Design a protein with these regions (language model features):
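Glycine-rich cofactor/substrate-binding loops
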Residues: 162-371
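Short, well-ordered beta-strand elements within core beta-sheets of diverse protein domains
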Residues: 2-6, 49, 116-126, 251-262
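Internal glycine-rich alpha/beta core junctions
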Residues: 12-15, 19-22, 43-194
Length: 371
């Protein structure tokens, strides 16, 4: 029952975090940010699309937590020390009165099992990993080098030495909390692996700090909500980095492929050649992607002349334009993101309602038990 209560706290906190993500995502459907691969701007994205990725990860975490909850919510009553008892105990009735879904039949495994506990902390560890990954992105986004995310002072601190510093303390704390929980998880699994299927004190040693780590996890989930709420995208900077980082170069190569019928590998070489030429001339800017440069690189790499106006080239390299061209679904295209948001809200609402009903049933059973 204690582990069941712990899972309830974690599930409630996670549901609250998904609500916050939905709220902020709905306000940033067209807020352009650069997506990154290998630490470099890659293609155009949006803040809403990023947040809904986190939202989907949390929904997956909720599924794991729910599965652990189903495993945990079984009654071991009547097993005694693992062999059962001669007392005439109505195990099914007691299980119902305590809000359990079912009874564990095998008297030995109901006492000696540790899988329910390991399943619980595994789900929590994966959830913590989700939180840490988001925190790493947010710290990077807020760095002076990236500078597309601005945290409010309520979740930052300065330096005791360097007064100009504005450190993303609350986001960094999320990563630290994850490290502590992963250490606890490793200890619990190691301890469980050394036990037998018979009851021993070793089986219960990793329970000692269980609630401490659950409380810290719940706080960590709260930090996610807080960091999302107390931050905003520097829209002009983000759009500038997205545009000037040539993140729509892939879209340009795709567009040339569709217009000319040439393979993408070839148009990729043409666009790449244009950008490399500008890099070698120390003139890397989207505005320097000219018709003459396109003509020269297409003749060099393909032996054909591809001619486009300056306006056409600039449109192909416009991040917002490239987003509207996406057709595969699930993309940062605002219409796709809006659709995912609506589906995500519906999924979260369904999970929330199921959880509410389960808690209400258990609460009702416990209240009747007291009566």
């Amino acid at each position: 029952m204690s582990v069941r209560k712990a899972l309830e706290k974690v599930i409630e906190a996670t549901l609250e975090a998904t609500c916050m993500l939905e709220k902020v995502a709905s306000q940033n459907l067209e807020t352009v940010i650069p997506y990154y691969t290998y630490g470099q701007p890659s293609q155009p994205g949006t803040w809403a699309h990023y947040l809904l990725g986190v939202h989907e990860a949390l929904l997956a975490d909720l599924k794991r937590l729910q599965a652990a909850y189903r495993t945990v919510n079984c009654s071991p009553m009547g097993s005694a020390a693992g062999i059962g008892t001669s007392f005439d105990i109505d195990k099914e009735s007691i299980a119902k009165r305590l809000g359990f879904d079912s009874v564990i039949e095998h008297t030995g495994i109901s006492i000696g099992a540790v899988d329910y506990f390991l399943e619980t902390i595994s789900a929590c560890a994966i959830l913590n990993t989700t939180l840490s990954r988001v925190a790493s992105d947010m710290v990077f986004f807020a760095s002076a080098e990236c500078n597309i995310l601005n945290f409010n002072f309520s979740v930052c601190e300065s330096s005791s030495i360097m007064p100009q510093k504005k450190n993303a303390y609350a986001a960094e704390l999320m990563r630290s909390e994850t490290e502590h929980f992963l250490g606890y998880t490793t200890t619990a699994f190691s301890s469980a692996a050394s036990t037998t299927f018979f009851p021993t004190h070793e089986t219960f040693l990793f329970f000692d700090t269980f609630w401490e780590h659950i409380d810290r996890l719940v706080c960590n989930i709260g930090l996610l909500s807080l960091n999302i709420e107390q931050s905003h995208i520097n829209k002009e900077t983000a759009l500038s980095r997205t545009r000037d980082g040539f993140t729509a170069a892939t879209a340009m190569a795709e567009q040339l492929t569709k217009e000319t019928g040439l393979p993408f590998t070839q148009t990729h070489h043409v666009v790449g050649g244009m950008i490399r030429t500008l890099m070698e001339k120390d003139a890397l800017a989207v505005t320097n992607m000219t018709p003459d440069l396109l003509l020269a690189q297409s003749q060099k790499h393909l032996g054909v002349a591809i001619q486009r106006s300056k306006e056409q080239i600039q449109e192909m390299l416009d991040p917002l334009h490239s987003l509207t061209c996406k057709v595969t679904g699930g993309t940062p295209k605002p219409a796709d993101t809006q659709s995912m948001l609506e589906k995500g809200v519906a999924c979260r609402t369904s999970v929330q309602e199921q959880f509410r009903q389960t808690k209400a049933r258990i609460q009702s059973a416990l209240e009747h038990l007291v009566d």
